[in-house]
Amino acid sequence: MDKIIKTISENGSFRAYVLDSTETVRTAQEKHQTQASSTVALGRTLIASQILAANEKGQTKITVKVLGTSSLGAIITVADTEGNVKGYVQNPGVDIKKTATGEVLVGPFVGQGEFLVITDYGTGNPYNSMTPLISGEIGEDLAFYLTESQQTPSAVGLNVLLDENDKVKVAGGFLVQVLPGAKEAEIARFEKRIQEMPAISKLLESDDHIEALLAAIYGDEPYKRLSEEEIRFQCDCSKERFMNALATLPKADLEEMRDQDQGAEIICQFCQTAYHFDQNDLEELIRDKS
């Protein structure tokens, strides 16, 4: 079971979220049949969405769009406050490019562009906020977004580790944020600890990477666990939703599908589920337009 653990330092100066998103990213890889770099890029963006949604309350949805100019194309993910996340990468077939230490690079395949966050509170007026991509490695881009757009100094680590067959071995991350009222000496101490932390990939390789992340973040600093919540890859698509989308098409288009194609098929971009609409389904929509 994937989870996010929310914590706060005992003095109330910082909060930290740590995530195990292994099954979430593994499910995304299986559904989209992504190659190595596409898997890591999509996985990191899914984790970024989970982190942002964890900051919200009520029935809020967070959409993250990584709009790069390179071969991956757009990466779109949507997370809600119930722990659900879905997403896709425009080009799932971008294969591996590794550093000397074996880490999968995604920045060169993301390229330059924008990091766009859409916050939907369910009121019909979603809030858009955008910052430039500074590295394309997603974690740094999320930290820059939080610091610039939300005016909250933040440290972020996200990664997806693959096995020798380029399948997801482990995925997770962390967010550390300064809270109002933190003293300069406390901020400096935490900044030093974050700078000296082992690489996120090393921490994820630990037997219990959740505890390894917390130990690296807090060191000897006392902290409280506020909550532990389940997170998962879960798409909210349905045949009814796509039926409603078909209903917006002109009557002539529906008649063409009925007569020439003997039906229609729609594949959900987010989870690759195929929905089939036979001639009777289309006839029902056509009658509604008469």
Curated annotation (Swiss-Prot):
<keyword id="KW-0143">Chaperone</keyword>
<dbReference type="Pfam" id="PF01430">
    <property type="entry name" value="HSP33"/>
</dbReference>
<protein>
    <recommendedName>
        <fullName>33 kDa chaperonin</fullName>
    </recommendedName>
</protein>
<keyword id="KW-0862">Zinc</keyword>
<dbReference type="GO" id="GO:0005737">
    <property type="term" value="C:cytoplasm"/>
</dbReference>
<dbReference type="InterPro" id="IPR016154">
    <property type="entry name" value="Heat_shock_Hsp33_C"/>
</dbReference>
<feature type="disulfide bond" description="Redox-active">
    <location>
        <begin position="235"/>
        <end position="237"/>
    </location>
</feature>
<dbReference type="GO" id="GO:0044183">
    <property type="term" value="F:protein folding chaperone"/>
</dbReference>
<keyword id="KW-1015">Disulfide bond</keyword>
<dbReference type="GO" id="GO:0051082">
    <property type="term" value="F:unfolded protein binding"/>
</dbReference>
<comment type="function">
    <text>Redox regulated molecular chaperone. Protects both thermally unfolding and oxidatively damaged proteins from irreversible aggregation. Plays an important role in the bacterial defense system toward oxidative stress.</text>
</comment>
<comment type="similarity">
    <text>Belongs to the HSP33 family.</text>
</comment>
<feature type="disulfide bond" description="Redox-active">
    <location>
        <begin position="268"/>
        <end position="271"/>
    </location>
</feature>
<keyword id="KW-0676">Redox-active center</keyword>
<dbReference type="InterPro" id="IPR016153">
    <property type="entry name" value="Heat_shock_Hsp33_N"/>
</dbReference>
<keyword id="KW-0346">Stress response</keyword>
<dbReference type="InterPro" id="IPR000397">
    <property type="entry name" value="Heat_shock_Hsp33"/>
</dbReference>
<dbReference type="GO" id="GO:0042026">
    <property type="term" value="P:protein refolding"/>
</dbReference>
<keyword id="KW-0963">Cytoplasm</keyword>
